[in-house]
Swiss-Prot record:
GO terms for molecular function: lyase activity; metal ion binding; phosphoric diester hydrolase activity; toxin activity. Mg(2+) binds at residues 58, 60, 118. It comes from Loxosceles intermedia (Brown spider). Coiled coil: none annotated. This is Dermonecrotic toxin LiSicTox-alphaV1. Its EC number is 4.6.1.-. It catalyses: an N-(acyl)-sphingosylphosphocholine = an N-(acyl)-sphingosyl-1,3-cyclic phosphate + choline; an N-(acyl)-sphingosylphosphoethanolamine = an N-(acyl)-sphingosyl-1,3-cyclic phosphate + ethanolamine; a 1-acyl-sn-glycero-3-phosphocholine = a 1-acyl-sn-glycero-2,3-cyclic phosphate + choline; a 1-acyl-sn-glycero-3-phosphoethanolamine = a 1-acyl-sn-glycero-2,3-cyclic phosphate + ethanolamine. Belongs to the arthropod phospholipase D family. Class II subfamily. Class IIa sub-subfamily. Binds 1 Mg(2+) ion per subunit.
Length: 307
């Protein structure tokens, strides 16, 4: 009987502590920041970037001419001071990613809550982009979402380089509906990363059947080898905060220097894509930031605009 009460007390304490943590996070009025590890294409890099402090990662996906997702691979050129040729077969990477984001798995990393797939559709046509979207949906469903049963829990962003390839989104959504898993679209967001005019980007989303503020992240940026102003980031932030805007969240890439991270956060970015997640962690601990910003957790909805 004594053992029972001890066990009950200990388990109850753990449950209460978990509930307290959730309450604290919901009560925290600081802006959540997504610390996005850039170019995570080899399986071992998942742990590497999470260990550095990332709560999100970006992974490149290449396609064959037949519109089949093939490798997680960036290739040359890429960011300065990075090795451009790390890779995995897409299916293998998705399986490893599932383990890293499935509670209870030995490889589970609770901090990893968001994955941006940089879809290298450059060599596809507008019509084959649709086929590529269907193919990638099939692969995610099978290898990441485990057929819809106890799969990975991370939120997913489909990041497309060309507005003309909006049909990738159409194909992706229709494939999940065809296979009876339209519910998984609740975990999927969208982005065009080619730095196009915001009004043209909005029109492309509408063609893809994505309504204003329907899981839309708007990116802006350039390789870390070059400098880029925050002008378009501020335009995107203004759109996000407008009552008639189309954007939910804004992220800036690729940002490695402390001063640039500070500037991006002060400009209103929700996410910072970086080769050095520890830099973002350090900045968020600084006196000027720790009272107003924090690392995003799984309790932060990435499709809701922070107010």
């Amino acid at each position: 009987m004594l053992c029972f009460f001890v066990l009950f007390f200990c388990c109850g304490t753990v449950l209460l502590e978990g509930a307290d943590i959730d309450e604290i996070e919901h009560a925290d009025k600081r802006r959540p920041i997504w610390n996005m590890g850039h170019m995570v294409n080899a399986v071992y890099q998942i742990d590497e970037f999470v260990d550095l402090g990332a709560n999100a990662i970006e992974t490149d996906v290449t396609f064959t001419k037949s519109a089949n997702a093939e490798y997680t691979y960036h290739g040359v050129p890429c960011d300065c001071h990075r090795w451009c040729k790390k890779w995995e077969y897409v299916n293998d990477f998705l399986k490893a990613l599932r383990r890293a984001t499935t509670p209870g798995d030995a490889k589970y990393r609770s901090q990893l809550i968001l994955v941006v797939f940089d879809l290298k559709t450059d060599y596809l046509t507008a019509s084959t982009a649709y086929d590529a979207g269907k193919d990638f949906a099939k692969r995610l469903l099978q290898h990441y979402w485990n057929g819809g049963s106890n799969g990975g829990r991370a939120y997913i962003i489909l990041s497309i380089p060309d507005l003309a390839h909006y049909k990738f989104i159409n194909g992706f959504k229709e494939q999940l509906k065809t296979q009876g898993h339209e519910d998984l679209l609740a975990k999927v967001g969208y982005d065009f990363w080619g730095n196009e005019d915001l009004s043209s980007t909005r029109a492309a989303f509408q063609k893809a059947g994505v309504q204003d503020k329907e899981h839309i992240w708007q990116s802006d940026g350039i390789t870390n080898c070059w400098l880029r102003t925050l002008k378009r980031v501020r335009e995107a932030v203004a759109n996000r905060d407008s009552s008639n805007g189309y954007i939910n969240k804004v992220y800036y890439w690729t940002v490695d220097k402390y001063a640039s991270v500070r500037d991006a956060i002060n400009a209103g970015a929700d996410g910072i894509m970086t080769n050095y997640p520890n830099v973002i962690v350090d900045v968020l601990k600084e006196n000027d930031f720790k009272g107003k910003f924090r690392m995003a957790t799984y309790n932060d909805n990435p499709w809701e605009t922070f107010k």
